[in-house]
Every structure is written in C-alpha cells, then in structure tokens.
Amino acid sequence: MNETDIQKLLQEANDHVPRLSFEEANNIISTVDTLIIDVRETSEIEATGLIKNAINIPKSIIDTNFDHSLIKNHLSNNEDITILVYCAVGIRSALVGHKLLKDGYRKVLNLGGFSEWASNGGLIDSI
C-alpha cells in the first residue's frame, strides 16, 4: 500500500468518524454512556497510562481476526452506548473507528490522541 492509498483511507475515515476536541470528549464522557477504547499497543500504555475507564484493544488485534466479544461484553446489549476510540495522536483511532462503523457499530467517535487528552488535564489511569 503506497502513501496515496494510506492518505485516501485516512481521509475516508476522517469523513465518517467525527474527531472530538478535548472539551467535546470530556462532555460526552460525563453525560452519555460511553465505551472508551485505547487502540495503542501495550508498550505505549505502559509508558503513559490510559484514559480513565478506557479498555485497551490494540489496533494490531483489531486488524487481524478481531473477536467482537471484546467490545460486545462491554456494551451489555446497550446499542445506545457511544464508542470513543483514541490512540497517540488520532490517526490509528480514525482508522479503527471507521472499521467499527463498517462492522456495524452505530455510534463511534474519534477522541483523538492521548497526548492531547493528557496535556489538557484529562483523567488518566496508570497500569
């Protein structure tokens, strides 16, 4: 896959999965039922922690033989839960968010990057 193909995939993902500002994400988390998914690799999370109450499902797992029960167990049959995805800066999360939409999840938003969340004082859990 060349750089042009990657840019097209990213543009398509960004067109379908809205990216939230810190304020928008914080408001949604405090007012709406959410499932927060960190798609960074485990080594990244070990170094920085993860957003409070987030679960980790690395993009590498989502891209290969993904078992949807990892998400469905957290949804508790509640289709109204909003799924927020994030990574380090928002690129992988856009791609994963788009995949989740294509897989049938209805409410998927890109929280963006952990670095923005942390620099704005967002709540973080260490592991």
Report residues per predicted region.
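Short, surface-exposed ligand- or partner-binding patches at beta-edge/loop junctions that are enriched
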Residues: 86
